[in-house]
Amino acid sequence: LQKSVVNSRALELIKVPFSLNGIQEDEDGVITGILEHEANAYAKNKIMNLYTFEEKCSMIRDYINQKILPMGVTTVVAIETSLIREREDYQKFLKFIKKLPVNIELYYSITDTDEIKARKMKRMGGDIGVDGSFTSRNAALFENYEDVDGNGDLYFSQEELNRLVLECYEASLQIGLHAVGDRAFEQVLSAHEYAQAICPGTDLRHRGEHAELLSFDQIKRAKKLNLVLSMQPVFETLLGNTQKGLYEGCNELYVESLGERHLRTNMFRQILDEGIVICAGSDSALTPVNPLLGI
């Protein structure tokens, strides 16, 4: 999730350092309680650390039994951060997931390639944020939003992202980068083009996560780079629906935030016709685990 809203008591307990980026203030300089970017990540980790490792595993087991198995899902991509930060917890987690009734494909969503290699993992990221989301109006766009000022935020410079992606190519690590808006996806494409020019011939099925607003040129470049696009079909149902009341909880977020650009959100047909592999998922728990709804 790209934003958190906390009250004054929560701010006091979490103790978010004021030096972190993303603490929203009003026109008088008073903290509003809305946290984004670094402050949001700090708050989420602080809250998760209130639970023991065993409590977290118990919640995972319950979620699988109650929400995932009833939907017929047999494989889950798990994108983890705080749960496996300590190497001892990572080893315990590997043993834990072997006992679960579903297959778990584990991603560690950090930017430290040395740590990934030390753990002998073959992939990293999955939710390394290049930008935010349309819901929070911080997905990075080339043109301004329709309903608010600004065109979103990029969380890396191009040089920083180039360096990270190149490190993955050189270490034969698959990387998944979260890029919702067209400006963010442009950064991802440029980083892969930079890395492939230096390390040609690598084919690790690198992932572009979400890819909700692309241009036709970007689709063609993604194909040339052999990127897999990890997308969420149900987003179009819940966020791009213009028939109010068709599904519970649906809205017109794409229309409201993007205007006419909503006509090129989630271009599944064009992406498939270009020969790109789409990995369709739910982005749970943002949307329910329900493959048939996505189909």
Please provide the spans of the model-predicted regions.
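Glycine-enriched alpha-helix->loop->beta-strand junction motifs that scaffold or abut catalytic
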Residues: 119-123, 193, 221-230, 274-277
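C-terminal active-site-proximal or functional interface alpha/beta core segments in diverse enzymes
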Residues: 197-266, 271, 291
